[in-house]
């Protein structure tokens, strides 16, 4: 991609970049010209093939000034004139003068940046000493020696694990000549990071191999790790570089506990077999304690889940309890796996694991549900019931169920504590919840005399000669008036007259 061009006003102002192709210049916002002596279409600038040319298209001419000459010359209209970087042109004789500037392309900019980086790297490498570059193979050889020593120790103690480690060591040895054959020289800051990464990788490789296993294999790996740290210290002290000493400190911090154990055993000059026995005993004790810790929370979890499931009786709530116990057991199992990795084999063989507990819990739920099955209320619609809600089927029985047609609600006996519905069997409410909460037994026959008389079974003690009682009583006086009253003829005539008067008034109002 070729570079572009820019126009720089001589009077000052922002540069104007020219797009590839033709651009019409004149009065307007592009060049910021407001003088009416300049036309809106004064000239055409064309960028093509990495070159710039101008063609005046207005009667007022444009002026050209080369970089060598100092005088503006008028251009002929409708003729192309090539402009080079450093040349100038103007739209008026003494005003609106623009200078041509070239913009380098992206490829050229990348090339210049690369060249400048190469020069900077060469200067830096010439100024810096060669010690870090020379120490690089020493560090790689030191790392290989450390890895070799760990390999020898592991082949003596654990031949099964040595096969995989030999493959890793061969891969590392294959990578070392590739690093040595590279001729590319890195900057100093990249070399520093590379050296620090290698120093950190030595203890990471030696420590990462001692992760899994139990019993004598772990003891042998610990001993091989101690041997590697001792040999590494000797070689790192002989090298005498600050970076190697930092790696020594890292390995020393990681193997601090194992060094203390090794020093106590070597000071007493005890045989390796006895030390291995003591270490294996301590590790077995740790494994047993971890297994006991794992058993306790599992048993507690089983008790809690069984207690929760026993309290739930409906099938819907039993499902919720089962899901809750599953979630709790899965969460507890994850936490136990994170706490101990060495006791995985024992915990897997343990009969009190979450899966067996869950199976027992489901069995107990099924047995409890069968034993405590409650007789449901018979649905009033019977075979014509259209409801499909499972809760409805839990509370009401239908034709085909074992408890359909019998006693509607368990507990409708003398021990039923539910309140009695005031309407009894004649209750018109059809809400099933109402029938569950209230009893609907036959109501006792009301005694009208008992309700009217306050003193039931007691003799009448009223004084019949009391004047107060005589005043309240009213004598019945028969009359000739009949209850079916019929209006007389006079009343009918009055009503007819009134209706006629009303109609006459309405007729007069219309006129």
From Swiss-Prot:
Biased composition (Acidic residues): 468-497
Purpose: Histone chaperone involved in single-strand and double-strand DNA break repair. Recruited to sites of DNA damage through interaction with branched poly-ADP-ribose chains, a polymeric post-translational modification synthesized transiently at sites of chromosomal damage to accelerate DNA strand break repair reactions. Following recruitment to DNA damage sites, acts as a histone chaperone that mediates histone eviction during DNA repair and promotes recruitment of histone variant MACROH2A1.
Keywords on record: ADP-ribosylation, Chromosome, Coiled coil, Cytoplasm, DNA damage, DNA repair, Hydrolase, Metal-binding, Nucleotide-binding, Nucleus, Phosphoprotein, Repeat, Zinc, Zinc-finger
Subunit relationships: Interacts with LIG4. Interacts with PARP1. Interacts with XRCC4. Interacts (via KBM motif) with XRCC5 and XRCC6; promoting recruitment to DNA damage sites. Interacts with XRCC1. Interacts (via C-terminal disordered region) with histones; interacts with histone H2A, H2B and H3-H4.
ZnF segments: PBZ-type: 377-398, 419-440
An example Gene Ontology CC term for this record: nucleus
Compartments, as annotated in UniProt: Nucleus; Chromosome; Cytoplasm, Cytosol
Chain residues that bind a glycoprotein: 376, 381, 386-387, 423, 428-429
InterPro entries: APLF (IPR039253), APLF_PBZ (IPR019406), FHA_2 (IPR041388), SMAD_FHA_dom_sf (IPR008984)
Modified residues annotated as Phosphoserine in this record: 116, 149
Basic residues bias (residue ranges): 304-315
Coiled coil: 487-511
Chain intervals with Polar residues compositional bias: 225-249, 263-293, 324-344
Superkingdom of source: Eukaryota
Phenotype for residue 116 to A: Decreases phosphorylation by ATM
EC number: 3.1.-.-
Domain-level remarks: The PBZ-type zinc fingers (also named CYR) mediate non-covalent poly-ADP-ribose-binding. Specifically recognizes branched poly-ADP-ribose chains generated by PARP2. Poly-ADP-ribose-binding is dependent on the presence of zinc and promotes its recruitment to DNA damage sites.
Compositionally skewed regions (Low complexity) per UniProt: 345-355
Upper lineage: Eukaryota, Metazoa, Chordata, Craniata, Vertebrata
Protein name: Aprataxin and PNK-like factor
GO MF terms held by the record: 3'-5' exonuclease activity; ADP-D-ribose modification-dependent protein binding; DNA endonuclease activity; DNA-(apurinic or apyrimidinic site) endonuclease activity; histone binding; histone chaperone activity; nucleotide binding; poly-ADP-D-ribose binding
Motif NAP1L motif, residue range(s) on this chain: 476-500
Transmembrane segments: none
Organism: Homo sapiens (Human)
Impact upon substituting residue 477 to A: Impaired binding to histones and ability to mediate histone chaperone activity
Family statement drawn from the similarity comment of this UniProt entry: Belongs to the APLF family.
């Amino acid at each position: 991609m070729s570079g572009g061009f820019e126009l720089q006003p001589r009077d000052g102002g922002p540069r104007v970049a020219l797009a590839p192709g033709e651009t019409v210049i004149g009065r307007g916002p592009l060049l910021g010209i407001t003088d009416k002596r300049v036309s809106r279409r004064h000239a055409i600038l064309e960028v093509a093939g990495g070159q710039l040319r101008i063609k005046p298209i207005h009667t007022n001419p444009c002026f050209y000034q080369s970089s060598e000459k100092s005088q503006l010359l008028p251009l002929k209209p409708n003729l192309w004139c090539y402009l080079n970087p450093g040349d100038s042109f103007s739209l008026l004789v003494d005003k609106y003068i623009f200078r041509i500037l070239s913009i380098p392309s992206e490829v050229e900019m990348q090339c210049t940046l690369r060249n400048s980086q190469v020069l900077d790297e060469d200067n830096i490498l010439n100024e810096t000493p060669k010690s870090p570059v020379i120490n690089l193979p020493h560090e790689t050889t030191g790392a290989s020696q450390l890895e070799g020593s760990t390999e020898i120790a592991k082949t003596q103690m654990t031949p099964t694990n040595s096969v995989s480690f030999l493959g890793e060591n061969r891969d590392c040895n294959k990578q070392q000549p590739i690093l040595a054959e590279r001729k590319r020289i890195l900057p100093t800051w990249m070399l520093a990071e590379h050296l620090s990464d290698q120093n950190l990788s030595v203890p990471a490789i030696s420590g990462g191999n001692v992760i899994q296993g139990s019993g004598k294999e772990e003891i042998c790996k610990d001993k091989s790790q101690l041997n590697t740290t001792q040999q590494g210290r000797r070689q790192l002290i002989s090298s005498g570089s600050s970076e190697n000493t930092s790696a020594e400190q890292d390995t020393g911090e990681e193997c601090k506990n194992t060094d203390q154990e090794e020093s106590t055993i070597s000071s007493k000059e005890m045989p390796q077999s006895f030390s291995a026995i003591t270490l294996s005993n301590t590790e077995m004790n740790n494994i047993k304690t971890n297994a006991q810790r794992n058993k306790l929370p599992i048993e507690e979890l089983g008790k809690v889940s069984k207690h929760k499931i026993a309290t739930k009786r409906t099938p819907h709530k039993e499902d919720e309890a089962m899901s809750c116990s599953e979630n709790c057991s899965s969460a507890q199992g994850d936490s136990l796996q994170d706490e101990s990795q060495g006791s995985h084999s024992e915990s897997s063989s343990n009969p009190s694991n979450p899966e067996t507990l869950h199976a027992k819990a489901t069995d107990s739920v099924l047995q409890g549900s069968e034993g405590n099955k409650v007789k449901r209320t018979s649905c009033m619609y019977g075979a014509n019931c259209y409801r499909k809600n499972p809760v409805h089927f839990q509370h009401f029985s239908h034709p085909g169920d074992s408890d359909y047609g019998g006693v509607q609600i368990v507990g409708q006996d003398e021990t039923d504590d539910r309140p009695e519905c005031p309407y009894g069997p004649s209750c018109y409410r059809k809400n099933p919840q109402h029938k569950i909460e209230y009893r609907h037994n036959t109501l006792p026959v009301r005694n009208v005399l008992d309700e009217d008389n306050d003193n039931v079974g007691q003799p009448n003690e009223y004084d019949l000669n009391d004047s107060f009682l005589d005043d309240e009583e009213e004598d019945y006086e028969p009359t000739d008036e009949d209850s079916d009253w019929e209006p007389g003829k006079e009343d009918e005539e009055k009503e007819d007259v009134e209706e006629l008067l009303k109609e006459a008034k309405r007729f007069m109002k219309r006129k």
